[in-house]
């Protein structure tokens, strides 16, 4: 089995490096040549185009930022689908929404190509091989992806048919967003009540309310947190809002958090421009 990986950004780089470290010798491609040049001496094959990755690899992991970037790699000039062979498996790691992967699976099936819906969660855990990979799709293509997934995943969880993994990831990220908003509120309340912030961070980070947003807030504050996290969380909450869903408190709180983060981002930028 030959493997390929496209999408050497913040999330994809440690995933590809785990594949290299495990001896899979993946075919790699990046839009910027300087990114690909970092792997000149690595145990990997460097492709000139996405089409070359498709011509050489049986299983290809795609970790692009969004649907537009994924489409560009698949269908653009010298894209994957210009050279993909029947039986090729595409593992879609980007968070792009259920409709996108369902449409993609139907579209590439006419070429004999398979899609595995496989968004990831965990961020920095990729470098340690401890990502959560949420998978959906047919068993045989999933099985072919397993050796690749095992290099960067601590857990691989199957949740159903194509689109179910995207839906699960969107629920996960909506919950993260909502929790983040409540963490902001908790610290704002603590300030109003005169509680020392480091002490409150220790309480919230050590007790029953502990969650990943608390230590991040404690380290960088709400404004910097918003600067860093807003683009991705905004994208994912917008995907949730595009679904035909009943009204839920989860989505309402997530939406309110995105609006609050946008205000905090603007305030932060304004404060920096006047100093």
Specify the residue positions occupied by each region the protein language model found.
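Helical "substrate-binding/catalytic lid" subdomain
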Residues: 164-275
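Rossmann-like NAD(P)(H) cofactor-binding subdomain of soluble oxidoreductases
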Residues: 50-55, 59-131
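Rossmann-fold dinucleotide-binding core
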Residues: 95-173
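Hydrophobic residues within alpha-helices
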Residues: 15-19, 104, 148, 189
